Amino acid sequence: MKAVGVVVEYNPFHNGHLHHLTEARKQAKADVVIAVMSGYFLQRGEPAILPKWERTSLALQGGADLVVELPYAFSTQKAEWFATGAVSILAALEADALCFGSEEGTIEPFHRLYHFMAKHRLAWDRMIKEELDKGMSYPTATSLAFKRLEGSAEHLDLSRPNNILGFHYVKAIYDLHTSIKAMTIPRIKAGYHDDSLNESSIASATSIRKSLKTKEGWQMVDRVVPSYTTEMLKSFEKETTFLPSWERLFPLLKYRLLTATPEQLHAIYEGEEGLEYRALKTIVSATSFHDWMTKMKTKRYTWTRIQRYATHLFTNTTKEEIHSVLPRGTESLPYIRLLGMTSRGQMYLNGKKKQLTTPVITRPAKVDDRMMNLDLRAAFSYYASFPPSLQQKRLKEEFHRTPIRIDHKPEPKKEA
């Protein structure tokens, strides 16, 4: 059986994701789609709007055959480590291809850029340091340094978020010496960071999350997500009375900051360049998460960088812990956690069982590993603001729930 991989967050699952899954299967001529999905906290340093189990169910209904978890150590990271973790998992599962959405829309420019950057790596690193020394944020420094390289204007636009991630997927495929074939499809209509809905049936996850904050917005969201996503969001909000967000977690984050020392905050992953002192200085007067973020943000610290630091602070994840679990070179991962599958996905795993060298696990009780401990701590942190009875139920689920089984259902047509 031929397998294509996709790397996803589904925050939440929308029509653009449905298009991506359909096109990935078609372009790769694949029998099976493997979705590597972030768990409770995401790449931009924010809690997922739905727990991973609900998002796994949506992924399976949307066309994925296997859903496996991208561990916390990779999911809340810069693009390079995020991509490395995802590609490592797909390589371990012997995926034939990886299909990602990008603003570029064709794959050859990504390969050309990889070879160009390999040739100019030392010069690029030196120029990045020069830009950082001027007080630039890391993303700005990398972008400015890239533009300074002779010949860079002929290459891929790395100022676009999905092009950046796509480049790192391709880079990881080369660096890990895998046989995975990289493929890309153009992102349609909505940009990654677009924050408002329009008349299109395609919208960004950012605009959907923003719209879910109002009653009118809920009605508009129905147009840009499959019906099963709407049903899942309504069902979850009915059970909890809220959708997870940083604002919901802010009182706990504020307590964490106010009871920590600068030394403790410096030990937290991504706590560098005086970020810990700025966090302590600004938290006292902050009245909300957005207020605190506005006070924290400078030319040097991007919104995403601060959110990632906040996530690691909230989960009490240290530099030492992350550095101890990140793989070196082509070192294999300790395990792959299976969250859900269809009968076709199960057939694929059964066929590969004897040749896979990385264990595929279904419950954390079956493994004692530092990477898994970080995942469990992320779950404890995510559920910290839930009502006690629901929190107990969810945490028990985290240890004992077996993979979700769903076979694809056709999406019912909506009334015009």
Curated annotation (Swiss-Prot):
Subcellular location as annotated: Cytoplasm
Gene that this sequence comes from: tmcAL
GO MF terms, alphabetically ordered: ATP binding; ligase activity, forming carbon-nitrogen bonds; tRNA binding
Keywords: ATP-binding, Cytoplasm, Ligase, Nucleotide-binding, RNA-binding, tRNA processing, tRNA-binding
Protein name as catalogued: tRNA(Met) cytidine acetate ligase
Function field: Catalyzes the formation of N(4)-acetylcytidine (ac(4)C) at the wobble position of elongator tRNA(Met), using acetate and ATP as substrates. First activates an acetate ion to form acetyladenylate (Ac-AMP) and then transfers the acetyl group to tRNA to form ac(4)C34.
Primary subcellular site in the record, as a coarse category: cytoplasm
Pfam family, one: HIGH_NTase1
InterPro entries xref list: Rossmann-like_a/b/a_fold (IPR014729), tRNA(Met)_cyd_acetate_ligase (IPR008513)
Residues binding ATP, per UniProt: 7-20, 101, 162, 187-188
Database matches in SUPFAM superfamilies: Nucleotidylyl transferase
Catalytic activity: cytidine(34) in elongator tRNA(Met) + acetate + ATP = N(4)-acetylcytidine(34) in elongator tRNA(Met) + AMP + diphosphate
E.C. number(s) listed in UniProt: 6.3.4.-
Biological processes annotated in GO: tRNA modification
